[in-house]
Amino acid sequence: TLDTQSIQDRNIYIVTVPTPVDEDNVPDLSPVRAACKTVGSVLGKGAIVVFESTVYPGVTEDICGPALEEVSGLKCGEDFFLGYSPERINPGDTVHTVDKIIKVVAGQTPEIAQKLADMYGAVITAGTFIAANIKTAEAAKVIENAQRDINIAFVNEVAAIFHKLGISAHDVLEAARTKWNFLGFEPGLVGGHCIGVDPYYLAHRAKEVGHNPEVILAGRRINDSMGTFVADAIADKMEAGGLKGPVLMLGLTFKENVPDLRNTKVIDVVAGLKARGLDVDVHDAMADAAEARTFYDIDLISKIEDGKYACIIGAVPHDDYRTMTAGQIVAMTTPGGLIADIKGMWRKMELPAGYLRWQL
C-alpha cells in the first residue's frame, strides 16, 4: 500500500529498504531514515520495528531508534522495541530459497528476540538463530558479504597474475579444488547491490572507530578494477589478431538469470572497450530495455545478426547463453573471430579451427 494510514497501529513493522553508497562509496542511509519517518508517523505503543536492510553495526539502535522516537514521540525500549533480522536471499537461486536459509534474529530484549524467532520460524523451514544482540546480527550480515567479496578479489588477483603467465585461471582452480579445504570461488565481475556495496559499510564503521580496514578496501579495489582489466585484455587479444570489431556483449545484468541491472560491472567492460575505439552491441533478454537506457544509456539489441561480430563476449551466464552450442556462437561471428568468456561458461566447448579464444 501507499497509504500510510492503512498501516497504523500494527504490532510488528518490517523495514527492508535499499542501503546503497554514494559516489564516494560512503553509506547512504537516506532510504532507512525515510522508512523510519514513515513508520514513526504511525507507530503505536508496544510495537516492534524490525530492520532487515544490510547496515553497519549500530545503525538500528543508534540511528533508527532515535529517528523513530523523534517522529513518534514514543520512548524506544519502553513504548516500542527494535529488532534486526538480516535479509538472506540469493536472487536467481532456486535451491537456496528464503525458506531454506536459517534466519538470524535479534531483539532489543530477549523477549523481543524470541517473539521475532517465533514469527519468522512460522515461515522459515530451516529454522532461526537468535544472535547475542542487535549489533552482533548487523555485523554478521555485513561480514557475510564482505567475506565473499574478499575471496572473489583473491581469485581475481591470481587470475590477473595467471593471465600474464599464460595460464588459465579456471584450469588452475579446477586442480586446486581437488584439495578438500580449498575454497571454490571463481574470478569475475563483482556487481549488484550487496557484495559490491556492503563491504563499504563495514569499512566506514571501522574508520569511525579508528581502524584502517586494509584487506576489505584492497578487495574492493581489485574487484572494482576488473571491468577495465577484462576490457583491456580482450581489446589486446583482438588487436593482436587483427580484429577491429564490432563486439557483441551477451549479458548486462549483475548476475545470471536475474533481470536486475543495479550496479552491474558489465558496464565497465563496455566502457573500456569503447575507450579502445571498439563498437559494442549489448544483448540481454532478461534485462528491461528501458532500464538499460535510463541507467546506462545503452540501447539493448533485441535480435542478433549472424556473421556480424569480430568478437563475442559471454559476460553473464544466463541459461540462454550458457547452453549455446559452438555452432550458434560461431554463426554470430566473422571468420576467425574472438570468443571471449568472462565466466568460463564455454571453456569446455570445442570451436572450429581458426577462431581465437580468451577467458578470464
Where do the protein language model's features map onto the residues?
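Structural/interface elements that position substrates and couple domains in central-metabolism enzymes
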Residues: 1-360
